[in-house]
């Protein structure tokens, strides 16, 4: 170096700051991990980003840009031809924690990690010099993500001489290009020492040749018009100062041919390798101010996708702290058939959606009347006079209403009259078709809810539920009382098999609708009863599904999510609720082995006989014999009493 070079003025070096570009896919993945995996754990997570090596200057690459996307969470996923940077994610749990955390101390802690890693390395390993950290808070309800990226930078007192010598660039650029192309991995050669042996140029990153000066090549990630290198160079310069270099030439290599050389001199008087250097590195905003950024994805994500994620949000939050072992997937996967689209059907459907159930089918043959909307939340006033003043069909309208509430639900409404025992068949073709449709619906669904108005309408679904081994839940209302129960399963031990809706009856169900006054035909109940019964019916299902035995669970067994009772009876007049157990009855008109076997043998023919004559069913299941034995026992009791004429008058 000439004397004029040695005495040239020294100026403080300038660098192009690094910025970040965080794609929406990064936050989408972060929200998924936060909800399902991280939960309340705010431990630091390893991630990675990348910087491209552009070949043409444009407004997007005039400064080095760290890119973060979906693949940043997969350490193994790395694209070729990019400079990959390792990093750490620190996702806090509250916005207050994000705001109040001491950013200076946090950057210092991160900088110490880089400093420790740097002074312990003996090579120019790219990963030791380039690290980033990102502090985040995820507002999963509003899809807002607060974040601040830091690139910890170690500062050493290097100065740039006012003299430039581009002869190094002209002399070595072609050789550097060839070496980079032959290496095929620009990441490994991001910073390397240039040396020559017999006129040939070599790049070495495995060791630093002992010297007070040297020539190094820095592969720059930006194409800024000014002759300023990226700020990433500062950590390499600190490393050289730590290793004893006082005078270095750096060739800042760029892909577009605009490479340049900078000569650096160390102020040895102010550099102390035994003292941790000043650490900087928080990214500035586009206005040049220090501060975090906000990514609001609410306006970018498809509303249907937003709704789908939001439906599951509160459910998954249960697993964070309250019920970590709750199996939500098994609930979500259930295909549910609701027999009845009235008051109970409406409330049960809403509660099922709240639990994330996506497949719900309604069966009902009624139309919406003016008295319905106030008690049945899936209907509105306009539904009462639609379809030429007849009112909408309940099943179809209920299915539409669910889709209006949540477009991601698969909901269907089927207008169907369920064949009822005690109501003789008047049109066999139609009744048989209805039976076939109902039977197919049972095959296509996992869960059956019996929510109809009349007692006899539940008989055939009860038989089908046992024959097809389905989970059947029954909900029935009185004026100020309710019953919620689950039916048993034929695979349960007979001595402990749960009873069904009809197991306490000594007569077969019959016509309860004919010759009834208005107050007897309408469901006259206190309005709150339906909500209570519906909620319990859905919560009972969830408890059943959490039990390893499912519908085979014995009465009142418990799971990690609570009990699994057989029956729940509630009474509003004294605001009491009772759990009951009723074993199966061997002569039950719906679930006895005799009835189920006969149904499996004859199918529709058996059903038709029962519909036309409930007495036939009583003979098949044995209730007729029970009734006869009871009558005979009564007669025998009367004979044994041997009343005289004076005592017999009170029997009249």
From Swiss-Prot:
Keywords: Autophagy, Cytoplasm, Protein transport, Transport, Ubl conjugation pathway
Origin superkingdom: Eukaryota
Predominant location: cytoplasm
GO cellular component: cytosol; extrinsic component of phagophore assembly site membrane
Protein location: Cytoplasm; Preautophagosomal structure
UniProt keyword Oxidoreductase present: no
Annotated signal sequence range: none
Pfam family, one: ThiF
UniProt cross-references to InterPro entries, sorted A to Z: Atg7 (IPR006285), Atg7_N (IPR032197), Atg7_N_1 (IPR042522), Atg7_N_2 (IPR042523), ThiF/MoeB/HesA (IPR045886), ThiF_NAD_FAD-bd (IPR000594), Ubiquitin-activating_enz (IPR035985)
GO BP terms in the entry: autophagosome assembly; autophagy of mitochondrion; cellular response to nitrogen starvation; cytoplasm to vacuole targeting by the Cvt pathway; piecemeal microautophagy of the nucleus; protein modification by small protein conjugation
Short motif GXGXXG motif, span: 340-345
Active-site residues annotated for this sequence: 522
Function of the molecule: E1-like activating enzyme involved in the 2 ubiquitin-like systems required for cytoplasm to vacuole transport (Cvt) and autophagy. Activates ATG12 for its conjugation with ATG5 and ATG8 for its conjugation with phosphatidylethanolamine. Both systems are needed for the ATG8 association to Cvt vesicles and autophagosomes membranes. Autophagy is essential for maintenance of amino acid levels and protein synthesis under nitrogen starvation.
Domain observations: The GxGxxG motif is important for the function, possibly through binding with ATP.
Assembly and interaction partners: Homodimer.
Family, similarity comment: Belongs to the ATG7 family.
Record-given protein name: Ubiquitin-like modifier-activating enzyme ATG7
Organism field: Scheffersomyces stipitis (strain ATCC 58785 / CBS 6054 / NBRC 10063 / NRRL Y-11545)
């Amino acid at each position: 170096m000439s004397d004029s070079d040695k005495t040239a003025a020294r100026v403080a070096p300038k660098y192009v700051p690094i910025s970040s570009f965080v794609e929406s896919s990064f936050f989408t993945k972060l929200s998924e991990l936060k909800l399902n995996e991280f939960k309340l754990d705010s431990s630091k997570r390893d991630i990675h980003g990348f910087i491209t090596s552009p070949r043409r200057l444009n407004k997007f690459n005039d400064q080095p840009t760290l890119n973060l996307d979906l693949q940043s969470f997969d350490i193994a996923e790395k694209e070729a031809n990019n400079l990959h940077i390792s990093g750490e994610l620190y996702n806090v749990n509250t916005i207050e924690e994000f705001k109040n955390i001491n950013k200076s101390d946090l950057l210092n802690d991160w900088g110490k990690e880089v400093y420790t890693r740097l002074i312990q390395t003996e090579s120019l390993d790219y990963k030791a010099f380039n690290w980033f950290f990102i502090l985040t808070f995820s507002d999963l309800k509003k899809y807002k993500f607060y974040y601040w990226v830091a690139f910890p930078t170690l500062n050493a007192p290097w100065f740039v001489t006012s003299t430039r010598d581009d002869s190094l660039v002209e002399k070595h650029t072609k050789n550097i290009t060839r070496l980079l192309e032959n290496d095929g991995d620009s990441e490994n050669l991001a910073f390397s020492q240039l040396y020559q042996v017999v006129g040939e140029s070599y790049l070495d990153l495995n060791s630093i040749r002992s010297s007070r000066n040297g020539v190094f090549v820095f592969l720059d990630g930006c194409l800024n018009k000014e002759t300023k290198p990226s700020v990433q160079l500062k950590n390499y310069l600190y490393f050289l100062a730590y290793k004893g270099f006082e005078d270095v030439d750096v060739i800042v290599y760029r892909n577009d041919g605009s490479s340049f050389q900078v000569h650096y001199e160390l102020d040895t008087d102010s550099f102390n390798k035994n003292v941790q250097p000043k650490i900087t590195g928080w990214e500035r905003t586009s206005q040049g101010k220090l501060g975090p950024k906000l990514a609001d994805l609410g306006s970018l994500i498809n509303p249907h996708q937003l709704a789908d994620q939001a439906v599951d949000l509160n459910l998954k939050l249960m697993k964070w702290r309250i019920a970590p072992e709750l199996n939500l997937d098994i609930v979500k996967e259930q295909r549910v058939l609701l027999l009845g689209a009235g008051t109970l059907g409406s409330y049960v459907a809403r509660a099922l959606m709240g639990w994330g159930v996506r497949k719900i089918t309604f069966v009902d043959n009624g139309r919406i009347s003016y008295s319905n909307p106030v008690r049945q939340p899936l209907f509105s006033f306009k539904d009462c006079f639609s379809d030429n003043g007849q009112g909408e069909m309940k099943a179809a309208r209920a299915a539409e209403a669910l889709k209006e509430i949540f477009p991601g639900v698969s909901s269907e409404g089927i207008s169907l009259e369920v064949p009822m025992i005690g109501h003789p068949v008047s049109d066999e073709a139609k009744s048989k078709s209805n039976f076939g449709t109902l039977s197919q619906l049972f095959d296509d669904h996992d869960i059956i809810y019996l929510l109809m108005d009349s007692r006899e309408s539940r008989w055939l679904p009860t038989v089908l539920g046992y024959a097809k081994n389905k989970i059947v839940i029954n909900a029935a209302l009185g004026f100020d009382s309710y019953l919620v129960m689950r039916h048993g399963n034929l695979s349960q031990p007979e001595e402990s098999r749960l009873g069904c809706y009809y197991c306490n009856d000594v007569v077969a169900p019959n016509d309860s609708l004919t010759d009834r006054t208005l107050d007897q035909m309408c469901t006259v109940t206190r309005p709150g009863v339906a909500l209570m019964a519906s909620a319990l019916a859905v919560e009972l299902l969830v408890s059943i599904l959490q039990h390893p035995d499912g519908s085979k669970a014995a009465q009142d067994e418990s799971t990690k999510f609570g009990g699994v009772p057989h029956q729940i009876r509630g009474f509003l007049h004294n605001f009491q609720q009772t759990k009951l157990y009723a074993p199966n009855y061997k002569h039950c008109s719906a679930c006895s082995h005799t009835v189920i076997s006969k149904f499996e043998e004859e199918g529709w023919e058996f059903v038709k006989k029962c519909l036309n004559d409930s007495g036939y069913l009583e003979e098949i299941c044995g209730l007729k014999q029970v009734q006869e034995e009871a009558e005979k026992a009564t007669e025998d009791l009367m004979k044994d009493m041997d009343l005289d004429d004076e005592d017999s008058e009170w029997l009249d």
